[in-house]
Amino acid sequence: MVRLPQAQGHLIVMTQSAIGLNQRQVIHRQVWARKKALRALYHDFHRQLFENCPAGSVLDIGGGTAHIKESRPDVVSADILSFPGIDVVADAHRLPFRNEIFDGVVMLDVLHHLERPIEFLKEASRVLKPGGCLAMIEPAMTTIARRFYDRFHEEPVDMNADPFALVAIDPDRDPFDANQAIPTLLFATAPACRRIEQTVPSLRVRTVEWHSLFAYPMSGGFQKWSLIPGSLVGPMLALERKVPAPVRKHLAFRMMIVLQRI
């Protein structure tokens, strides 16, 4: 077993080789252990995801390095790649669970990596109990954020893509391939949300909110640098919550999307 860095104080050196693990995930776990600001931000993301789900069983899709379990250990974490803390290795398009088993499904930066997002939404609906919720936090292509993502982020942004298209599944596809525009194309407007509900009639779009204005971009995410100390994340998030919604829609780097199973 590989002992990975823990988010307590300084980085703990791995006691064994991480051979067999995806090296990008190993690096992410190392950055997670070092950056207090990153952990503070993601714990707040986790809180928001859980608050938008009913009480009960929760499935975390695209769990990555399983950091969500620091917020809630009983969550079932699934990912297409194996990693310590991941309970189920599975493709999000074909979940290995029976119908109507979970009260909530949560995802953080996952939808924009999926080849067939509509197929996934149908699969999420299948495993949700009636009244259950799918809560997602994803990149938002707002006035400010899109310029940042276009220039500085390694993942591409293609606003001309058709997220409803039936593309062939590529078995050799890199699971980190992405189009950061997908969540915005699917949920940023009322007509887009109506099309989702028509295409997946068992789901209703409950909320689409815009957040992550200042603290998240200043943290550097999973990059090694940060422009904000961990102690300032809480006060800055409190300030962000006071920004009026019409302004947030132009400044936000992320969007919270909640769909409910009917």
Specify the residue positions occupied by each region the protein language model found:
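A C-terminal cap/extension of S-adenosyl-L-methionine-dependent methyltransferases
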Residues: 43, 198-262
